[in-house]
């Protein structure tokens, strides 16, 4: 593998498979939320955010008057299918945030991640996250890592609701605009080649993170590493 050393004002990071083991999400977070989808909707039915989630789920179903049990069944099915749909991600985020706050969940990281993030941040590189998981869940994840609360290292958090689909170049342009950085001065790190293609089309530099044991192993035309320790990011 090559050893990329991009110069960038901003390093934008994926989570699952990039900073954190996919298994930590699939075997811990997803089951934790799935078991609580129905109870959460029923117990927090007066919460404005839950009402918004239910309304958006009904819109996706094309059933404006769908009963709550129908909505819960749809959310559960989308969870089982790992659908990247906004109402599911928002509800999972609420449940996960409560789980992190209760000490029942931990934001797992690969061992090389926290030292690299601190090193890049100290060098003057701004950091941000772009994940299909909700912004609320992202913040909770990085606040409760074995390496401590890392949220102070990040300038921004983006999800499919705030930025758009991760395979759409427009999402990366939107993030660059929000953070007031030109795309050519930003680098995106992910384990999914289609996401890297989209970021590249938006003008970002890219690095494929292909870690042993993770499900994605196609770098495409992107420089690649197996660990953050194999690369450096120089402040532009």
Curated annotation (Swiss-Prot):
Bifunctional enzyme that catalyzes the enolization of 2,3-diketo-5-methylthiopentyl-1-phosphate (DK-MTP-1-P) into the intermediate 2-hydroxy-3-keto-5-methylthiopentenyl-1-phosphate (HK-MTPenyl-1-P), which is then dephosphorylated to form the acireductone 1,2-dihydroxy-3-keto-5-methylthiopentene (DHK-MTPene). Monomer. GO terms for biological process: L-methionine salvage from methylthioadenosine. It is an enzyme of class 3 (hydrolase). HAMAP family: Salvage_MtnC. Keywords: Amino-acid biosynthesis, Hydrolase, Magnesium, Metal-binding, Methionine biosynthesis. It catalyses: 5-methylsulfanyl-2,3-dioxopentyl phosphate + H2O = 1,2-dihydroxy-5-(methylsulfanyl)pent-1-en-3-one + phosphate. Disulfide bonds: none annotated. This is Enolase-phosphatase E1. CDD domains: HAD_EP. Pathway: Amino-acid biosynthesis; L-methionine biosynthesis via salvage pathway; L-methionine from S-methyl-5-thio-alpha-D-ribose 1-phosphate: step 3/6; Amino-acid biosynthesis; L-methionine biosynthesis via salvage pathway; L-methionine from S-methyl-5-thio-alpha-D-ribose 1-phosphate: step 4/6. One of its GO terms (molecular function) is acireductone synthase activity. Its EC number is 3.1.3.77. It holds the Pfam family Hydrolase. PANTHER family: ENOLASE-PHOSPHATASE E1 (PTHR20371:SF1). It comes from Frankia alni (strain DSM 45986 / CECT 9034 / ACN14a). Its cofactor is Mg(2+). Binds 1 Mg(2+) ion per subunit. InterPro entries: Enolase-ppase_E1 (IPR023943), HAD-like_sf (IPR036412), HAD-SF_hydro_IA (IPR006439), HAD_sf (IPR023214). It comes from the Bacteria. Belongs to the HAD-like hydrolase superfamily. MasA/MtnC family.
